[in-house]
Amino acid sequence: MIDEKFDAIVVGAGMAGNAATLTLARRGLKVLQLERGEYSGSKNVQGAILYADMLEKLVPDFREDAPLERHLVEQRFWMLDDRSHVGLHYRSEDFNEEKPNRYTIIRAQFDKWFSSKVKEAGATVLCETTVTELVQDAYGKVIGVKTDRSGGQIHADVVVLAEGVNGLLGTKAHLRERPKPEHVALAVKEMHFLPRETIEARFNLQGDEGVVIEAAGTISRGMTGMGFIYANKECISLGIGCLVSDFQKTGETPYGLLERFKSHPSVAPLIEGSEVKEYAAHLIPEGGFKAIPQLFGDGWVVVGDAAQLNNAVHREGSNLAMTSGRIAAEAIFQVKSRREPMSAKNLSLYKTMLEESFVLKDMKKYKDLPALLHINSQNFFLTYPQLVSKAMQNFVRVDGTPKVEKEKRTLRAFVEARSWFGLFGDAFRFARAWR
């Protein structure tokens, strides 16, 4: 195993880990990145959304060779009951710009490319290596890691934990608590392959245009969760995720929900005739601002999913991961350049910089929303989608019924389902959590 000491060790080679390692290496630090997979991205078969602004800060010319799928020109939001959907669509030619704002990607391909940039920057990347625990001195300061390789103890001034939402290393070292089931979602995803021209016809796309569909409603059977559909070049990424605590409580299975989503009348035609080649499950942080653990300590910082950095409202994760990794690396570099120890006091600069960025500002804005949706999941993910769907059908159906009577019928349905007190209470709580 490696005997030398490093300025920094990064555990994990996802978005946050690669961003941190790349930044550290470019700053001239001696950095080692450890990844348990065969290569970066080997365990990430799913599709995802890439936010260009954050990647440009790391790799300005990424569009020249990054494995991008489609640039997004349309966003669709669906509220589903069992037989229909009520939708809000936004599509703009402004997104057919020279440098598009968002792309769909296949993580296995993209992460591998991202890792190549890390290696080009001079970092040492060691794959197929599992970090089993953190090495701490007599005072509890993290001074390195132990791996599953023989003689696998490696030392560094600071360790960057980018190990994903489970955060087992930090938990094992008593640096943080294990994430609560209500703060983590389990998402199951499939890749449905179709000819490129078929995808473009079904989604009304031209060239490399792409679309994202996000869906909520009865597909989650009253649990807190959402479904999603991403159009890639020659495949469709489709999946659904719900809180782990809801799966435990209801006994529902992720695969059962996925089949329910795929068979929905609004979804089935989009994937008809497709070939499923890949299936994966993935844990996603959903606890929001109040679930963020301790972000730094003596000799360590935590970034990305491991830090619960995910904006569930806007479905932003990869940009928060890349930004937190970059900011953590910048903070470490500043401490290093001042020749100061990697103490908790000095590494608190990382949190200060996060607070000054959009990352924690956005998460703080929606700090009360995750708990509100979880506590009221039956109403927001079951009752209201059914009521809204019936209201829309009542509105567009022409059957000779006077419009005044139709309006009364719709209002009566809402009041009978939730009462006036419940309706105003839900609206007030939702508005307060959103502001």
Curated annotation (Swiss-Prot):
Keywords on record: FAD, Flavoprotein, Nitrogen fixation, Oxidoreductase
Coiled-coil parts of chain: none
Pfam family, one: FAD_oxidored
Required cofactor(s): FAD
Disulfide bonds: none
GO biological process: nitrogen fixation
Superkingdom of origin: Bacteria
GO MF entry, a single one: oxidoreductase activity
Function: Could be required for the formation of a functional nitrogenase Fe protein. Probably accepts electrons from FixA/FixB and reduces a quinone.
Assigned protein family: Belongs to the ETF-QO/FixC family.
UniProt name for this protein: Protein FixC
